[in-house]
From Swiss-Prot:
This is Glyceraldehyde-3-phosphate dehydrogenase. Belongs to the glyceraldehyde-3-phosphate dehydrogenase family. Homotetramer. It comes from the Archaea. Pfam families: DapB_N (PF01113), Gp_dh_C (PF02800).
């Protein structure tokens, strides 16, 4: 049973903590917060996690709020086999020095630059690259979504190049200080966006260019993907491959799943914790091969698709499972992923 510390108990961190707790080969030894808010309280009182603080000077604030703390982040990582770092992107470099000093392995999130660790991770496409290493980085939610489907398609279609338009949600549902609320914003207003180069960190040699924009919604991202392929394949072959791939769902707009709102409702119907949709939904009707070009549309639940990737990254770094598909299957079973 490996010991996992979660540094940063926010949107991703709290989900990773619950995912770790659901496994039978690892356990949560602590989570961290910097402020005594409702997440801090529920972590301790509802989830039963030991809570450590990232800013020791705020210990009195937690005491005044009546939230029990177990120590500092430095204390927490001493007991860990690996730290899953879910802190804001600007904190990563200084945390890395702390982890190195403590001699503990660490997994970062996609908000950090690839250069921080020199390794990026996706369970399907490059699990082996991080096996036994000290530090890696799970790529962002959008990059995870692109990589899952492209790495499934490539073996049968032989991808020549990819062009994708990323329609990004303006903010997460709980964020009240971000937007836009009445605008479409090129983000960034140049090509390429960072998503294409990020895909290249986990799919070596792929020719991919992306452009992105923000829209006034909070539910999910949506991708419009155009792929030039070398092999002659039928549309149904692409559909079959995507249907066989776990963590990808081929969904039918004709059955009432024609929007991101309906996909989120579907997650509720599945009884998912926090209404999470870990899988990447691809609209069946959008999948089309025309000559040497493949087109499809997909959605990404930005709060949760990277969560199972973090579990597999733990197994890779700690050499708990050498076969990526076995780790994926184990994670999926514990989390109820299709």
């Amino acid at each position: 049973m490996k010991s996992v510390a979660i540094n940063g108990y926010g949107t991703i961190g709290k989900r990773v903590a619950d995912a770790v707790a659901a496994q039978d080969d690892m356990k949560v030894i602590g989570v961290s917060k910097t402020r005594p808010n409702y997440e801090s309280r529920t972590a301790v009182e509802e989830k039963g996690y030991d809570l450590y603080i990232g800013i020791p000077e705020r210990a009195d604030q937690f005491k005044e709020a009546g939230i029990e703390i177990a120590g500092t982040v430095e204390d927490m990582i001493q007991e860990a086999d690996v730290v899953v770092d879910c802190t804001p992107g600007t904190i990563g470099p200084q945390n890395l020095e702390m982890y190195k000093k403590a001699g503990v392995k660490a997994i970062y999130q996609g908000g950090e630059d690839h250069e921080l660790t020199g390794l990026s991770f996706n369970a399907i496409s490059n699990y082996d690259d991080s096996y036994g290493k000290d530090y890696t980085r799970v790529v962002s939610c959008n990059t995870t979504g692109l990589t899952r489907t492209l790495s499934t398609i490539d073996p049968i279609a032989d991808i020549k190049k990819v062009r994708a338009v990323m329609v990004r949600r303006g903010s997460d549902p709980s964020e009240v200080k971000k937007g836009p609320i009445n605008s479409i914003v090129p983000n960034p207003p140049k090509v390429p966006s960072h998503h294409g180069p990020d895909v290249k960190t986990v799919m070596e040699g792929i020719d991919v260019t992306t452009m992105a924009l923000l829209v006034p919604t909070t539910l999910m991202h949506q991708h419009n993907i155009m792929v030039e392929i070398n092999n002659e394949v039928e549309t149904q072959e692409i559909i079959d491959a995507l249907e066989k791939r776990s963590r990808v769902l081929v969904v039918d707009a004709s059955e009432g799943l024609g929007s991101t709102a309906e996909l989120m409702e579907y997650a509720k119907e599945l009884g998912r914790n926090r209404n999470d949709l870990y899988e990447i939904p691809v609209w069946r009707e959008s999948i089309n091969v025309v000559g040497n070009e493949l087109y499809y549309m997909q959605a990404v639940h930005q709060e949760s698709d990277v969560v199972p990737e973090n579990i597999d990254a733990i197994r890779a770094l700690l050499e708990m499972e050498s076969d990526n598909e076995k780790s994926i299957a184990k994670t999926n079973k514990a989390m109820g992923i299709l």
